């Protein structure tokens, strides 16, 4: 659809491969099949990317944007946290995901004109009520029934039956941006006997060095502050 949108003249594709209209890249494209010819009567005033500009590429945490208009899906944080079916236990780039839990907008946020795209001009009471529960700690401790019935229909890039990815993504973000306030949450999660998603291999333990240590006691994992 991006290519079709560009050919139709409603926007352009920039160096990070996202489709941009005059209002930026935070757009959702839909296509309609019709049996009548259309005449394009409005010319867009979109300026192309500057030849030497590489803000989007420099902002990519995993260097997935290898060159202008070239992106490796195997290393894109947005793909790895959603539909690619990644396995955190074997993902070598997990410590570069920063705070991203679902998707990634780093390359879009870096584009200067997108910085003006988010405007608090409308109120969405239902969204505000829901988002107050959508924090890293809330996700980690959430019931799977809530993730399945409330979260997944809205953040559907993670497919049904894979709701555990919300938890692993949130835990990964907590490890990447460790704060002592996370320790009780990690402990509680461990006691829930789902530690296989948290502290399962030596690579994860290395990331916790100097932050959280793991002590195996009575057959369960206990996390504590060093």
Predicted regions, residues:
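Short Fe-S-cluster ligation motifs
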Residues: 84-102, 136-158
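Structural detector for internal amphipathic alpha-helices that build alpha-solenoid repeat scaffolds
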Residues: 167-177, 199-208
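Amphipathic alpha-helical repeat scaffolds
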Residues: 99, 168-172, 187
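Amphipathic alpha-helical scaffolding segments comprising HEAT/armadillo-like alpha-solenoid repeats
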Residues: 147-153, 179-190, 211-219, 224
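Alpha-solenoid helical repeat architecture
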Residues: 158-160, 190-191
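Short inter-helical turns and helix N-cap capping residues of alpha-solenoid HEAT/ARM repeat scaffolds
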Residues: 163, 193-195
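Catalytic cores of enzyme domains
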Residues: 1-132
């Amino acid at each position: 659809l991006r290519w079709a949108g560009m050919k139709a003249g409603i926007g352009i594709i920039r160096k990070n491969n996202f489709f941009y209209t005059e209002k930026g890249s935070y757009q959702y494209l839909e296509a309609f099949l019709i049996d009548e010819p259309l005449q394009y009567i409005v010319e867009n005033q979109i300026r192309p990317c500057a030849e030497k500009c590489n803000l989007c590429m420099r902002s990519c945490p995993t260097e997935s944007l290898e060159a202008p208009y070239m992106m490796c899906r195997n290393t894109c944080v947005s793909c790895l946290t959603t539909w690619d079916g990644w396995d955190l236990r074997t993902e070598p780039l997990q410590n570069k995901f920063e705070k991203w839990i679902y998707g990634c907008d780093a390359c879009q946020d870096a584009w200067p004109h997108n910085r003006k795209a988010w405007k608090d001009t409308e109120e969405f009471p239902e969204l505000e009520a829901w988002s107050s529960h959508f924090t890293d700690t809330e996700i980690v401790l959430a019931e799977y029934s809530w993730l399945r019935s409330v979260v997944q229909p809205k953040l559907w890039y993670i497919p049904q039956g894979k709701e555990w990815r919300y938890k692993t993504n949130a835990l990964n973000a907590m490890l990447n941006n460790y704060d002592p306030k996370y320790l009780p949450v990690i402990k509680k999660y461990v006691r829930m006997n789902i530690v296989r998603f948290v502290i399962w291999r030596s690579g994860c333990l290395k990331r916790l060095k100097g932050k959280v240590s793991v002590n195996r006691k009575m057959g369960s994992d206990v996390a504590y502050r060093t």
